């Protein structure tokens, strides 16, 4: 009887499976190399199964068909963006692209005059090579999951390419247009007497092609440390592009609190020196991308790759600098290097005998893992975790010397508005490097005299 009952119950499951199989067989081999016209009938007639994806059961037929048609173009765009972002394994392709661009810009007239007819054949030959590469890629990665991975890579690389533009607001664009228009006489002088338009186009193109290379990134980071370079960029573009000194306002507000603290503690004593110890904390944020792994590339609407405790954008430890000595305030680092907090501010429990900090940690040490929305923290990495962060700390000291009582204004909206209006009347054009609204200095655990500063309102100008 039990066997008879089982035979009566199982046909339902088998019928569902056959129905699902019949729905999916027209897209199972959608990524196979095809000949002839690509149409809906081609999908229906194709009966050969190569490698199906579990996503086929939940993806509508029209969506799958559109993704299949889009896949070859995604492969081409992905390879092109890999060259632009220098994220490919073959650096020779980048160098070849730079060489061809240089030759085309400098000798475009000569090439078109004597080899224009051969250029047409060369373009067709390049197209055939690209088509062959696309077909090989489709044959080696013939599933719907591979299409999704390529789409993720294209999205991430496109965000990286457009990141210098997407950060600009409408007001920034208007300011840039006004500044560039104001500098038109300088541009005309350069193109007429110094450099021809071809050379200017060559310089601009090479800058774009090498913008994401490691060497150029390091050169920009090194040059950006010089205030002259930052001011030059500001006067050319009219934009506040931030940089290593975008924590200047942060320290300006901290200086005010220190002046008030020292005055209240030591009283009216001339030439009084006071050393205050601070522990500065930076948080490194990363996101997991399918097919790539953990990277510092974040979504456009979420926190930056480096932030402070309040999620304000912060420079990375390599470019984080203390302010220069001014107004009786002398800042200097107490620790030699930045150290990773292996406990992540006490969240990760370590044995009592284990070290709590590390100067050169591993790539995966000290992280707290979260889900896709930065919730549900955990000390272990699982397949449900897509974001993570860890804490870097470094101790700094500030020595103060005062002869007179400092004037510390209360941080009220009215006082800030009045002060901003006065500064706008008299101040000259200068650069501001931060838009942070809060300062939080985490006190050290040493026995020295410490201060905790939080929720400090920023002054509108330095």
From Swiss-Prot:
Alphabetized Pfam families for the sequence: Pex24p
Keywords: Membrane, Peroxisome, Phosphoprotein, Transmembrane, Transmembrane helix
Family, as annotated: Belongs to the PEX28-32 family. PEX30/31 subfamily.
Topology in membrane: Multi-pass membrane protein
Residue intervals on the Cytoplasmic side: 1-90, 197-462
Protein name, UniProt field: Peroxisomal membrane protein PEX31
Transmembrane feature ranges: 91-111, 176-196
Cited InterPro entries: Peroxin/Ferlin, Peroxisomal_PEX28-32, TECPR1-like_DysF
Miscellaneous comment as given in the Swiss-Prot or TrEMBL entry: Present with 238 molecules/cell in log phase SD medium.
Modification type Phosphothreonine: residues: 435
One example of a Gene Ontology biological process annotation: peroxisome organization
Protein's gene: PEX31
An annotated GO cellular component: endoplasmic reticulum
Subcellular location: Peroxisome membrane
Modification type Phosphoserine: residues: 432
Lineage: Eukaryota, Fungi, Dikarya, Ascomycota, Saccharomycotina
Region (Disordered): 1-26, 406-425
Domain of life, per lineage: Eukaryota
């Amino acid at each position: 009887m039990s066997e008879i009952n089982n035979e009566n119950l199982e046909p339902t499951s088998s019928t569902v499976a056959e129905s699902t199989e019949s729905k999916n067989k027209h897209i199972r081999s959608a990524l196979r190399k095809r000949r002839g016209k690509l149409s809906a009938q081609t999908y229906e007639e194709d009966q050969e199964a190569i490698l199906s994806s579990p996503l086929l059961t939940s993806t509508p037929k029209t969506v799958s068909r559109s993704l299949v048609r889009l896949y070859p173009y995604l492969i081409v765009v992905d390879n092109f963006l890999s060259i632009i972002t220098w994220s490919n394994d073959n650096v020779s392709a980048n160098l070849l692209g730079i060489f061809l661009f240089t030759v085309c810009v400098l000798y475009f007239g000569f090439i078109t005059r004597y080899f224009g007819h051969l250029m047409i054949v060369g373009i067709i030959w390049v197209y055939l090579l690209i088509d062959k590469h696309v077909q090989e890629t489709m044959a080696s990665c013939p599933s719907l999951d591979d299409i999704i991975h390529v789409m993720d890579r294209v999205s991430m690389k496109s965000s990286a390419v457009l990141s210098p533009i997407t950060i600009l607001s409408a007001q920034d664009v208007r300011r840039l247009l006004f500044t560039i228009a104001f500098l038109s006489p300088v541009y005309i002088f350069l193109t007429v007497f110094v450099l021809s338009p071809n050379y200017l186009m060559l310089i601009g193109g090479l800058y774009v092609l090498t913008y994401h290379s490691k060497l150029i990134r390091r050169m920009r980071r090194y040059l950006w440390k010089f205030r002259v370079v930052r001011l030059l960029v500001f006067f050319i573009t009219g934009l506040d592009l931030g940089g290593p000194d975008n924590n200047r306002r942060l320290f300006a507000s901290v200086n005010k609190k220190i002046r008030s603290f020292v005055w209240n503690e030591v009283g009216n004593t001339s030439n009084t020196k006071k050393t205050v110890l601070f522990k500065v904390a930076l948080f490194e944020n990363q996101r997991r991308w399918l097919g790539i792994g953990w990277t510092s590339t974040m979504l456009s609407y979420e926190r930056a790759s480096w932030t402070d405790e309040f999620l304000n954008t912060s420079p990375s430890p390599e470019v984080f600098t203390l302010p220069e000595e001014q107004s009786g305030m002398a800042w200097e680092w107490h620790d030699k290097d930045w150290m990773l907090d292996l406990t992540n501010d006490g969240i990760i429990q370590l044995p009592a005998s284990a070290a709590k900090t590390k100067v050169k940690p591993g790539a995966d040490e000290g992280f707290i893992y979260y889900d896709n929305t930065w919730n549900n923290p955990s000390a272990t990495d699982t397949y449900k975790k897509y974001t993570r962060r860890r804490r870097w700390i470094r101790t700094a000291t500030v020595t103060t010397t005062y002869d007179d009582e400092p004037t510390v204004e209360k941080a009220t909206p009215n006082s800030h508005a009045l002060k901003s209006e006065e500064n706008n009347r008299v101040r000259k054009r200068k650069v501001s490097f931060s838009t942070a609204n809060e300062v939080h200095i985490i006190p050290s655990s040493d026995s020295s005299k410490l201060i905790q500063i939080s929720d400090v309102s920023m002054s509108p100008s330095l």
